[in-house]
Amino acid sequence: MISGFANFIANLKNEFNSDYIVFALDSKGKTFRSDIDPNYKANRPEPPKALLDQLPVCIEMIEKMRLCSFCQEGYEADDIIASFVKKYSKNMQINIVTHDKDLYQLIGENVRVYSPAKKMLYDRDGCFEKYGVWPEQVRDFLGICGDSADNIPGIKGIGEKGAKKLLENFGSLEKIYENIDNLPQNRQKDLLIEGKENAFMSKKLASLYDGLEVPDLLGAEFPTENPLLKITEILKEYNLNRILSALENSKDTDKTLNFKAITVSTKAQADKILNDLENVKEIAFDTETTSVDSHNAKIVGFSFCWDEKSSFYVPLAHSYLGAPDMLDKNMAKRLIEAIYTKFIIGQNLKYDFRIVRNNFGLNPPAKYADTMILAWLMDPDNSVGMDNLAKRYFDYDTIKFENVVKKGENFSSVDVKNAANYASEDAWITLKFYKKFCGILSTELLDLAKNLEFPFIKVLLNMEENGIKMDISSLKEMINEIAEQLKILTNEIYDLSGENFNINSTKQLGEVLFEHLGLPAKKKTKTGYSTNESALSAISDLHAVVPKILTYRELYKLQSTYTEPLLALALKNDENRIFSNFLQTGTSTGRLSSKNPNLQNIPAHGSMAVQMRNCFVSKDGFSFVGLDYSQIELRLLAHFSLDKELLRAFREDEDIHSRTAISIFGTSDKEKRAVAKTINFGLIYGMGASKLSNELGISRSDAKDYIEKYFKAFASIKNFMENLKSEAKKNGYTTTLFGRKRYFDFANATPMQFAMYERESVNTKFQGSAADIIKKAMVEISPFLNENARLLLQIHDELIFEVRDDISESFGKKMQEIMQNVVKLNVPLKTSLSINKRWGDLK
């Protein structure tokens, strides 16, 4: 908690850019709500002792940082916030930082709620989108469906969906009861009549009191100096070394960090810059556009900086009434062509390269560096966003996008002068990032960036632009088939459970399974019964409805997450191709991640996985060529551990899972091989006996016995794993095959975090090293790609190409050779090659 709170303080100014800050604190003891209902908050479990011990430290931190806090006996922090809102919201914008949904009732014209978990600001529309009710209906909503966290009862039997529908029709709790005689005679009406007293009491409990006498804001000003500098002793006491390091960096920084923002809008200015550029070697470059979607965004302007004293902005397409003259696009292209002959520095260059290619037809430059990637190599678990980096390394508050661009508008509507300040700052701070990282990153990591991560940017750029074709008719057929199956399953579930309910509501589902049907449940939490996959799988043999629910969920997710969204995307493109975005810095291990849409999560297993993947097809005259590294993480285990038996098995090309099965069970039949496969891969991810017993459906003692036999068969592996964890604890990081580091704060970890860090330190070694290898393979493959052979997807250890039919086999074999020889390990790398017209048919 202390670490999290310190990080929260460190990011406050950066995230909110506020003039004032007030911490509202709960009072000790009972509040006036306990007089309304003695059971209010009565069932709350006692907070963990570690949390109770750390809370006073956090309050001490607030006091020592001289930040404003307020507490009122008999009232909750929420009431204090409501009173501040009432007093000040007419004249200033207020952001409420909270996890609690009851505070959404305070949202208004100048009041928004910020969710720390989602890192999102919610206004009136955001409240409706999140909860399905307007801010003024939040109290009514809680009056109906209650709030288990605070033991607010609500109306028993009416959940969130029912509450939303009632409020949509009637507007408020009072109006519902005014019209209750007009409601159809059904179970819901009976529940409303029976629960009326609870409903109005619950609404009263959920209503915030805003009549407290709160102080003025004198003394609540946001400090100009970093408040954490006042509590360095506390930070040292709790070993918050990363924060202390950032503070140390900020002390060494020139706090003025001034530069001159220059707007370039005439040919004469551009000609002078072209002349000045002749003596420039390195230049930071950034684009401003109409959208974050680089595939469709239009350029509005671009900025560049080479000496930290001045930074330039070239406006091209500002379209507001009264916008000044801007540089001719042909002249702008000449400028970019000249800039591209230099060493380019950018923050998320893949985006800028695509914008320039799409808007000017220019291919990326030969030499470049990306500070986002350098920041990620420095600390892969931390934010690599520009605003956060500026604050972390220079204690500098950048101009925020939302303070420049009005809601619902884009950068083209921004006044050119304001745009110049914002955009010029982006280029200027990017240049500073580059110089900073060149000074603090190790030579090994700088070399890794130069030789692997930077060239990989172009590989991803081209892969994303290729997209992949969808078979529209197959998708539609699948959508109809799933819809029909869901309809049948819904009726079967209703029949087996004896009632109709919202199957997608975890609350209603939990009540049906564990209360109405009486099935055994794990302990009920404040949010209700657990109905996740593992919880349902554990009781799937106890009632016929449970397997139906699991099948329903699988199909519903397939429909809502994949088939319907993919169809919508495919129909937007003339060739029915969809285009994903691959994130190079999206994971801590080094693996790529994919979004909009996430093509790496297309189901590979399940009843309809092949059918789903077969909706992805090659274009006419071309085939998919799939190349998949075989057991790469197990081969890395052999490489790192030097276990003699494992080395021998791979060198002799044995079936490693059969070999493991024989070592543990003395036989390698299909069933035993499957168990061995689970053990082989599970141990790499830090799986213990408890997890293995759940995975295999066996007793914990049997699972423990299997693991002991495994380590007996492969004697060196256990020592290697233990040494790997010990090194991570000693050094505070794990290193991958190519030298990337992932850091773990073992010193300040809770027991649960400590165990997680141990697992992740092992996982990162293998998953991160596998990511290194396939990235290097993709870079080495890229010179062989052209209009006849294009790389479409990377699915972790697998590459999928679209290749002209007549060369598909020879191309596949050539790529196979490259992939298998991209790095020299103590065991051979092996890939499987498959060629087909549909993704699902690749073996």
Question: Where is each model-derived feature located?
Answer:
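Noncatalytic, basic helical substrate-engagement surface that gates or grips nucleic-acid strands
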Residues: 1-97, 101-123, 198-215, 219-220, ...
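Conserved catalytic core of nucleic-acid polymerases
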Residues: 412, 465, 572, 579-580, ...
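Active-site palm subdomain of RNA-directed nucleic acid polymerases
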Residues: 441-452, 456, 775-799
